[in-house]
């Protein structure tokens, strides 16, 4: 159904010249159609591998449907997805046109890189399993509609890796990254502007953050809200695992088991000390400032401890490693479950 929905405007309207209106907007909409068709096929590729490629609206006829239900080898499906994304890239406007709030050229390039990397690594690491076209035990080799096809798995892997690198490079070379200024928490009374990297995940607008390619804006006045920032403050029966926390390196680049600077895990403060600053920024610990906004009831108080033993699931952290990512120190955004900050 998703494929048909994407195909209809592309094949029945644009190519026939029957769609009228602003030419630039129409091009962008068609680009979105190719993007979402590629997304539909990518999801099916991940689930099924080999699958039919349908490039037109089919008649409601059993013979026609059966004829078009022949499974195409997965590498050809992946190439088809990349072709759709190339078309999307050629039609879509850049991120700046709609401030990153619509599918854009850069987002399509990044998605192309993801698709290509997925297929390259799948074929590389599943070679010989019977799931890759070219394997001796690949079931598709016995299908008459694949007769005469030859597959070089190594060549396909090289092709997809190259496509992934080229697409990603076009995005990375033109995206200004948000700088982490190494400030781990604000001073009391400082609400915003203390660390742009931390605030990137919860500020009201990301229009001027070029590295965020696609984002959704929330508005309390329009009754469009979410509760992520409030929930990470209260616990919400969530939490990072100990294994995840231990996977972060020390700031000197060493793993915790190889560093004399690791202070152990008697407290979360100890766990975070001297570690990768992403762990320091995005996990609450005993001394972390809870509220810096003077209007907040718990202004200038420390977090103290996660509610790991609390029977109320809404304010319980089930692991003790309570996320601080997506939190905002603007109390007007977090008095209750209705938030207006952005979502990436």
Give the positions of each predicted feature.
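Enrichment for repetitive, rod-forming helical segments
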Residues: 44, 112, 119-121, 331
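An aromatic- and glycine-enriched ligand-binding surface/loop that stacks and positions planar moieties
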Residues: 1, 49-51, 55, 86-87, ...
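Conserved, well-structured interaction surfaces
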Residues: 1, 7-48, 64-105, 268, ...
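Primarily recognizes Gram-negative and organellar outer-membrane beta-barrels
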Residues: 61, 76, 127-128
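Short, conserved phosphate-binding/catalytic loop or strand-edge motifs used
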Residues: 56-62
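Short acidic (Asp/Glu) and glycine-rich catalytic loops that position anionic groups and cofactors
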Residues: 62-65, 143-145
